Amino acid sequence: MGSCARLLLLWGCTVVAAGLSGVAGVSSRCEKACNPRMGNLALGRKLWADTTCGQNATELYCFYSENTDLTCRQPKCDKCNAAHPHLAHLPSAMADSSFRFPRTWWQSAEDVHREKIQLDLEAEFYFTHLIMMFKSPRPAAMVLDRSQDFGKTWKPYKYFATNCSATFGLEDDVVKKGAICTSKYSSPFPCTGGEVIFKALSPPYDTENPYSAKVQEQLKITNLRVQLLKRQSCPCQRNDLNDEPQHFTHYAIYDFIVKGSCFCNGHADQCIPVHGFRPVKAPGTFHMVHGKCMCKHNTAGSHCQHCAPLYNDQPWEAADGKTGAPNECRTCKCNGHADTCHFDVNVWEASGNRSGGVCDDCQHNTEGQHCQRCKPGFYRDLRRPFSAPDACKPCSCHPVGSAVLPANSVTFCDPSNGDCPCKPGVAGRHCDRCMVGYWGFGDYGCRPCDCAGSCDPITGDCISSHTDIDWHHEFPDFRPVHNKSEAAWEWEDAQGFSALLHSGKCECKEQTLGNAKAFCGMKYSYVLKIKILSAHDKGTHVEVNVKIKKVLKSTKLKIFRGKRTLYPESWTDRGCTCPILNPGLEYLVAGHEDVRTGKLIVNMKSFVQHWKPSLGRKVMDILKRECK
């Protein structure tokens, strides 16, 4: 075997250095662009040839070996029979180890003018170079072809001829660099041991990113074929010109070495056998190059040609073999509620090319591009992290007492907290009973009691009480005023209970800001400027939705500006909420935290007054100077 051929086998000559094994930043952990090891793709696979010496019967063949002065030695002759191991010269002999079995070869049938050798692969592979070592004189003309569709179509890699112009009508790359034909490997000398070497990463491909589309088109193969088109004789001079040579008309090849690697787009450094593929039993098959990638960089597929199921937030890319950039696939943001996602180019473009992942088949009663909200009929349980499988709980609204939301035919609760929209006069978290002062729970809600006090919620009969106060005066006509820049609260069916709406049953002591020592002595957890948005009767308690406009004090609590809920003392205990909190108005509120639940409590110990800038300044001064 020639020196360059041995170098190609051992180190890959310049091909590997310029190509796949020269990937920037290659490491065993495949942190950057990486490629599986290279090897002989013919090893462990079946090589095909049109004919084989002695395939039908024993044949006689002869060959010359020349001296240095080109005079022919005495020809040597032998027999071949494909059915007898010691006389066989099968195509598989071209794929065995060139070092362990250097004197084995394939030989065609006698007097064959055209011959074909073909390697069929079970998957797509990267092909880098071919080394052929001839026992017979090299052909006067031959073609190297490849297929990328398992033999359906073929494209030429290289033409070989003693005269490219005369044989194929092509220019010779010995004269014109980069031409598709060459005369370099078509000389009949030497009569035996002549090499043919083809490098797939020759110019102009040797400077490209080895995973670019251009290089893939050049290197990717599923089949490789060599067509031997024209024999030529050994050029040595016979001493006896009258002695006609016999049995020299055949092709014979020692080695057919197809160097390449598993094709993984730069996303794997190891490969395993393709499912269902069985290697040919031959010595050294444990060194064979397998065809299914063990993908890294969050990629998947036999060739890491697409992103893993939950990593489609950006377009898939091959790694960059020049810079070493792995171009990893990025995970979709599905909040733990989906196993797969897909890339949507419209979503990608709408995001400014930042995120294009759309979660598939959201689980755990969630929906949305990122499974980011509960489905209609479910609400967000704030006690659980949203990634928890039970973060969305089913609404439990009473079918009679709950109102149907606009544009829906089914009753749904507030998806943020599970509150049900109740019909007029209906109370309770699930809208399952009448409010105090109402009766006749039914399809149209509950009716007001025709009493000065409360009435029986079922019959409507008045219930007398010594605490009842005359209700026969008119209620003030109060309507909450919303700032046009602020969105109005949507749950209008749940009305707020306050002394203003139920003044006949409620007496709240007017609060004044006394001395600073008394104010500081209350040790309030929070002091806020708020605007009342709405109040909601929950049957056992009232929730007041507010907008925090300014935080004057907060201790261990993390309180921010924006919407929040306050929890006044239960109106079921007092008949109203005290201190008075009327929707649409602004207040200064100082109160305590329920250490068990973390709720902001408003009760008779709280300080509540209508907001005035002067009041705010005075309280801030007390907090800074006195409350230490």
From Swiss-Prot:
Species of origin: Pongo abelii
PANTHER family xref list: NETRIN-4, NETRIN/LAMININ-RELATED
Keyword Glycoprotein annotated: yes
Ranges of residues in domain NTR: 506-627
InterPro entries assigned: Laminin/Netrin_ECM, Laminin_N, LE_dom, LMN_ATRN_NET-like_EGF, Netrin-4_NTR, Netrin_domain, Netrin_module_non-TIMP, TIMP-like_OB-fold
Cystine residue pairs: 262-271, 264-293, 295-304, 307-329, 332-341, 334-359, 362-371, 374-392, 395-413, 397-420, 422-431, 434-446, 506-576, 520-627
Recorded GO CC terms: extracellular region; laminin complex
Reported function: May play an important role in neural, kidney and vascular development.
Name of the protein in question: Netrin-4
Keywords, ordered alphabetically: Disulfide bond, Extracellular matrix, Glycoprotein, Laminin EGF-like domain, Repeat, Secreted, Signal
Domain Laminin EGF-like: 262-331, 332-394, 395-448
Record domain Laminin N-terminal: where: 30-261
Single biological process term from Gene Ontology: basement membrane assembly
One Pfam family here: EGF_LMN_ATRN
